[in-house]
Regions:
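Short acidic, glycine/serine/threonine-rich loops at helix termini
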Residues: 62, 67-70, 97-100, 139-144, ...
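Ferredoxin-type iron-sulfur electron-transfer modules in oxidoreductases and energy-metabolism complexes
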Residues: 1, 35-50, 77, 82-84, ...
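Short amphipathic, charge-patterned alpha-helical segments
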Residues: 112-118, 251-267
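Short loop-to-beta-strand transition segments
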Residues: 69, 125-127, 264-276
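Short, surface-exposed connector motifs at secondary-structure boundaries
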Residues: 121-128, 241-244, 331-332
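Hydrophobic alpha-helical positions that pack around
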Residues: 1, 82, 133-252, 263-266
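C-terminal accessory/binding modules appended to enzymatic or scaffolding proteins
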Residues: 231-244, 250, 256, 418-438
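Iron-sulfur-cluster electron-transfer modules
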Residues: 1-180, 434-436
Length: 438
């Protein structure tokens, strides 16, 4: 099995979402109740107040305030007099992210109890858990549901295809509704009209786990670690150059360098933060920047879903970026022209920069195509992809100059940025083979 099939866990500071996992492989129902105790019963307003007090944010990438999601569903229920639905987004379709899989495999009741807490507060009668094809994670979640009668009556597991865009909220809602599981052509709010056209509270699996921790600890204890404006701990998925890839739980405010050090992960030319819709930081900045949304934003980064991918030494940075640009172009749902046409144009331009055939003209094409795509898609995929590529062009200036003016940087493309298995990434993987020495 791959070492990330059952992710290793590391901690800096107190264990919260990873509590008990230092002594148990998987936390069953009895152990979960022993470690976390009973969840308090809370009203929707109490839950909103707690989430607001600690500024609880979504853990899936966008970082949307959880209290605002809750309030939007409460308002929609009052307006329509329809019962709400709760959806746990555990698809985790992005390569490099495995924090949700870790919780599903090893602490499934933390996710499920958080979802049940929200469902009770909202008076929802049904919870959907959206998953993809990780059999170990799916078996663990299904076994956890089967072992608890209250969950058996409440929770249904729904499997999405293994694609990058499967976790987009609109794509997940469409999938559950029996439609093609791609982002809708027109942006819609799940809180207004989601599963079965009912008001739907949809959030990431780790967000529900955080909600359970918040309910157990209460806002004051929850906020006793981390920075005051963004308290608590977060889960980071660290791989790339890491000799010890792991899910790391740490308080906000901890320097990213401390996380890289415990994972034995040299930064090399740079570190990608926030996954393939994230941004690059140079090594010096990466080691000093504090973990958290505000700290990373102040340094030009983005927290996203907590993915940390250091490049390490000895690989071609732009070659790595080009592989991923090709993969992301192939993951488009193909329904928006800027995405369907623009992302392949960016990928081709990046490939010709790296192989030395494109020069300054290819660089101009990449930048123009990115500008043409940005802000024009129905979902976040084109914007995220252009952000990833343009950030690389800003951070890897020395490598860019070597390729544009001298055709090569002389380093191989080692494949430090992960790609999923399967035919849809064959072209991107072939690039790595073709550029044995770029």
């Amino acid at each position: 099995a791959d070492e990330l099939d059952v992710p290793t866990i590391m901690r800096i500071g107190a264990a919260r979402m990873t509590a008990g996992l230092d002594r148990m492989g998987r936390i069953d129902l009895a152990a979960h109740q022993e470690i976390f105790g009973p969840l308090p019963r809370v009203s929707a307003q109490q839950l909103i107040d707690m989430a607001e007090q600690v500024d609880l944010r979504g853990q899936g990438g966008a970082g949307f305030p959880f209290a605002r999601k809750l309030q939007a569903v409460v308002d929609a229920v009052k307006r329509t007099d329809q019962p709400p639905i709760v959806v746990v987004n555990a698809t985790e379709g992005e390569p490099g992210s495995f924090k949700d899989k870790m919780l599903m495999i090893r602490s499934p009741y933390l996710i499920l109890s958080g979802a049940a807490l929200v469902a009770e507060a909202l008076e929802a009668e049904e919870i959907f858990v959206g998953v993809t094809g990780n059999e170990l994670a799916n078996r663990s979640i299904e076994a956890a549901i089967a072992a608890e009668p209250g969950l058996r009556a409440l929770v249904r597991v729904f499997q999405q295809p293994d694609r990058f865009i499967s976790g987009e909220s609109g794509a997940l809602v469409r999938g559950i509704n029996g439609k093609k599981p791609i982002p809708p052509g027109r942006k819609t709010l799940a809180a207004e009209k989601g599963v079965g056209d009912l008001p739907t509270l949809l959030s990431n699996a780790s967000t529900f786990a955080q909600g359970a921790v918040l309910a157990v600890l209460g806002p004051e204890r929850f906020a006793s670690v981390g920075v005051p404006e963004e308290p608590g701990t977060g889960l980071l998925s660290v791989s790339g150059s890491a000799k010890r890839p792991a899910v790391v739980e740490c308080p906000t405010g901890v320097p990213l360098g401390a996380v890289l050090d415990i994972c034995q992960a040299p930064a090399g030319d740079g570190v990608l933060i926030g996954g393939y819709h994230g941004m690059w930081l140079d090594a010096e900045t990466a080691y000093q920047v504090p973990i958290g949304r505000e700290g990373l934003a102040s340094a030009g980064g983005t927290f996203g879903s907590g993915i940390v991918l250091p490049l390490g030494d000895g690989t071609c940075p732009l070659g790595e970026v080009s592989r991923i640009a090709s993969y992301l172009a192939g993951e488009s749902s193909g329904q928006c022209g800027p995405c369907k046409l623009g992302l392949p144009s960016i990928a081709r331009a990046m490939a010709s920069i790296v192989d030395g055939s494109g020069g300054i003209e290819a660089l101009d094409v990449a930048r123009r195509a990115a500008a043409a795509v940005n802000g024009r898609g129905a979902c976040s995929h084109p914007d995220g992809t252009t952000r990833f590529v343009l950030s690389a062009l800003e951070v890897f200036t020395e490598d860019l100059a070597a390729h544009v003016f001298h055709s090569t940087c002389g380093r191989p493309v080692r494949g430090m940025l992960p790609l999923p298995e399967g035919p849809e990434v064959a072209e991107a993987k072939q690039i790595m083979v073709d550029w044995a020495r770029c």
